[in-house]
Amino acid sequence: MTVKTPAELKTLYESISFDLQTTYTGPLGQEYAVSGTHLRLWAPTAQRVEVSLYRKGSGGEPIGTLPLERGQQGVWSIYLPGDQHGRYYTYTVTVDGISRQTGDPYARAAGVNGTRSMIVDLARTAPSGWERDVRPVIPPEQRAVWEVSVRDFSQDAASGVRPAWRGKFMAFTQQGTTLHGDGIHPTCLNYLKRLGVKYVQLMPIFDFGSVDEAKPLRRQYNWGYDPTNYNVPEGSYSTDPTRGEVRIRECREMIAALHAAGIGVVMDVVYNHMYRNENPLNDTVPCYFFRQNEDGSFSNGSGCGNEFASERPMARRYMIDSILYWAQEYHIDGFRFDLMGLYDVETINAVRAALDTLPGGRDILMYGEPWQGGGSQLHRYEANKANLAMLNERIGIFCDDTRDTIKGGCFNAREPGYVEGRPGSFWDIGGAVAAWCRSDRLPPHAPSQIVNYVSAHDNFTLWDKLLLVRYEKPEFTAADGTALAQNRLAAGIYLTSFGLPFLQAGEEFARTKKGKCNSYRSSPALNRLDWERAEKYHALVDYYRGLLALRARFPRLSSTDPHAPDALYFFSLEQPLVGWQLPAQWGDGAAWQALCVFYNPTETSKVVPLPVGRWQMLSDGISSSLWRGPARVYEHEAVLMPYSATIFGQI
């Protein structure tokens, strides 16, 4: 078939006949065996495909170039006899007389910077005991997600991590790390086990293009939302990016170490765009995998130059294949979808259905950002907030309604939210507590679809936002008692709300990026987790720790029952106070018969009436672990401290 322009390609790809002729369900990529390896590439518009073989992942001439044979549905294949483990390769794909050299879109391993793919025997990359690694069983009431970049986690010299492992996958495997090695103040994995979060969401760990793996990291830094190879771990996070098997083994070691600590791993996936338009997908089948405008040019709903055409059959298949590969070969416990609004509902639901077919697959988390990064040519139902009712009930969304209600809008640094005293915002706090199940604004299938948060890697840290609202020229590194109290209040709200709690790493120790709202390529020093700050703000860390443990002892807040929030009873209080009562679900093992919670966003103490009964104070807004000590029992009324979330349990 001969096509000349991107517009003609668009017409071709959107035709039913093209789908019928080219949709393929057989194996793609490498099929390794000691006796030989099959390579298969879907390239239906190509006139010729060749594979060049190399001894190394970079440099040197090919040791041979061989033609592939065209088969049905546009699949090209070749069989390479003998043990090919460790052999690097590239394809040369010729379409309309233009030849492009590229990697394998289905590559599982790659050389430095991902330019050359590598044939790999995955069994040889398995760390010791990998066959015994299993996903931890984490009940809903214990679920809370802590988001971090592999680089940020340990690159601070104070982390106590050995220098060669700082900023690498292997840092997650080092046991017993402490601040400057003092043996007292925990850091990294040691810290996570004490904090009590049960999921770590890792910012992109697939191979991305914005860091040069061939050069020392030093001042190089990027979050990694720049995909190059979707099925290959990032080389800069390995101790040797020149050897394709090392990054696989070390990524698996990291996951196994987290699992051994009882912590699940959520992978941040960015199928919505690729780093460059010249990439293995586009070089193999020009324009097919990316959404197009009417003139054939790339649509840019990602804001990054292109957007993935999830609605096209082989693009949808690629995305599902990739997700299943990570779930099966890396034992991933959850997937966070960047710009999920750029995918069609049918594809996202198909991903959920595919995961559910795996052993334990129904427990794999799945949630995403229900928005886009710009105008899109997706003319189907988008997997966004407006179409939440069309998504599977076990596909969650980041709730910007909750985020903005609590702390203020993220696009205006000075805009206050409830915790900073925004007038009228108390009306929406009730909606947030109920995970919007009792609101027409955002009715989910179940409260567990709502991801509650006030900070993530995008936009200002919570601490910086609080200071920017209060001060014209904030001192971000200075202690501030009011901001600390507002920070505690913000956490107290979303950690006592229905839904899935989520926090940016370091939110619990007043993480600052000194007012930088988008640090995706800022200095490593600005982005790193400051472990000395974690010790300085240890009382705030303990506050989060206590709330997480308290929440786990009242399972109804994490219920998947769509009617669970109906049991909330909101009190009539003076504005802007908010108070509510929630009985425990019979037989769920709750530590208290009911919870009674009050939020006070004012700078003065307030007296509030209590419901009939005996109420133990669990948290006074400063200490969230009062429930661990001698019972402080109240009846009739209680005093709320300024800027506080006060929690009582009925006994």
Where are these regions (language model features)?
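Glycan-recognition and catalytic regions of carbohydrate-active enzymes
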Residues: 24-26, 493-516, 528-595
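Conserved, mostly hydrophobic/aromatic
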Residues: 41, 91, 148, 202, ...
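Conserved alpha/beta catalytic core and glycan-binding cleft of carbohydrate-active enzymes
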Residues: 120, 352-353, 357-510, 516-520, ...
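C-terminal accessory region downstream of the catalytic core in glycan-modifying enzymes
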Residues: 479, 483, 529, 547-549, ...
